[in-house]
Amino acid sequence: PAYHFTPDVTAGFKPEVSLLQQQSQAELDAQAKALLQAAGYGPNNPLKLTLLYNTSESHQKIAIAVASMWKKKLGIDVKLQNQEWKTYIDSRNTGNFDVIRASWVGDYNEASTFLSLLTSTHSGNIAKFKNADYDKLLAQAGRETNPAAVTADYNKMEQIIADQAPIAPIYQYTNGRLIKPWVKGYPITNPEDVAYSQTMYIIKH
């Protein structure tokens, strides 16, 4: 499961333990029910929404699982909608959705390739999230020269995401690799999943 937006394997990123990791599932369920009730939803007035995803068997399975859990735990009525890629992109770009499935693979091996997506002016900000403190933290991190200070800024940004939930990360991409023990320099901690031959070498065996 994903406890942060930024993958844990990202170079230089040292995530703090999130609220999701500190509480039991029962406690989290109770909080979700309380938030729904505070928003005016409940058994007599269930929240109804559409979950949009681009056509794919794996995306469909995840969407069905999410809808089932939301119904069972929270009484939410979820309608599933799948669209072919071009139509899906149009819906995503115009904001024509209630909840949408999306993913991101880093452009470079540093946390800002993920966290920058939720800044208010980023073209990839599908959630249309706007938070001045969040924007300020990313700009501040870009000026820092102390790695510990950068990590602190990134963790504060992750906390804002956790508190305000513009997105709900559920998993991170992983790829299995079989690497001979005499092959060294293969980048294990790299969310790009890019391996450059110039960094690898073979030891005597």
What are these regions (language model features)?
Residues P1-A38, S56-K61:
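Structural transition elements
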Residues H4, I62-I64, A111-F114, W182:
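Short, solvent-exposed loop/turn and secondary-structure capping segments
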Residues D29, K33-G106, P147, N175:
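Ligand/substrate-recognition segments at binding pockets and active sites
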Residues F97-D98, L118-S120, P187-I188:
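Short, hinge-like loop/turn segments at secondary-structure boundaries
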Residues Q25, I76-N93, T113-P181, H205:
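Extracytoplasmic/peripheral linker and loop segments enriched in polar/acidic and small residues
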Residues P1-F5, P43, Y108-E110:
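Proline-centered turn/helix-capping motifs that create local helix->coil transitions or kinks
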Residues R177-H205:
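Long beta-strand-rich cores associated with HINT superfamily self-processing modules
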Residues A2-D8, P46-T50, Y171-T174:
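Short coil/turn segments at secondary-structure boundaries
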